[in-house]
């Protein structure tokens, strides 16, 4: 009997690996060629006589009503020039990132065949960490000043924010921005809706960034992932006992969904926990749903939170 079970297990692994190989070959064969436009470099190296040409080629970066002197002053500003120097030092060779972008968009096109490869432009902006990457149907804009490394001298931010100012966070941030075009915004305050929304976003990263670690996908440290895994059952019991899954209390979003140094159970474990544990748990629910239901990704993204949760058969690991 044990021999039969062993043979079945081996066959299952073999079939799974063969299917994965076929899928990967199909993804690799998708033609994607990305040309990254280094607007940051063009802007800070332009001359007054060439500024008009730059404005013509990139009108969306030059709001009407501003005199050329505004842009020339920025180009010559010592602080902006120092920031540009640091970005150029880090990203003088952008080819590795370009290759990663091409790999990512092969995965995107495999799962979403109608998606067109956008025009990719890098910029240096105002360190708006809530908009590190902006994705539209035709444009992908990446703010390079927010990927210099968490210990960079320019970053005067709390650790829980600047820990994701690493180059390895660039592709996960692209997927986060891409997901905004695919996911309908949450229209209610129910905690479960928020959890499943971000769970879907993270599941997209499972599909589109298969070689990335869970820590990189969600923007945690490995230790924070370990904490969530070890306390999954405890957190889930807390959510059930406090009856907050279906609650519309707006405070829950700040306690368990939004960026924060830690999550707020109002218990001793708070200081040990990472922020956003609700998004991590929503991820596990969506993963469980996809494991137990044969649903295309486009359909998953349209489904409501209650249906996903009820059909997920989610049980935290002991």
What does each model-identified segment do?
Residues 13-16:
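C-terminal motif of bacterial Sec signal peptides marking the signal peptidase cleavage site
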Residues 78-228, 298, 302-305:
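Acidic/His-rich structured neighborhood in mature extracellular/periplasmic domains
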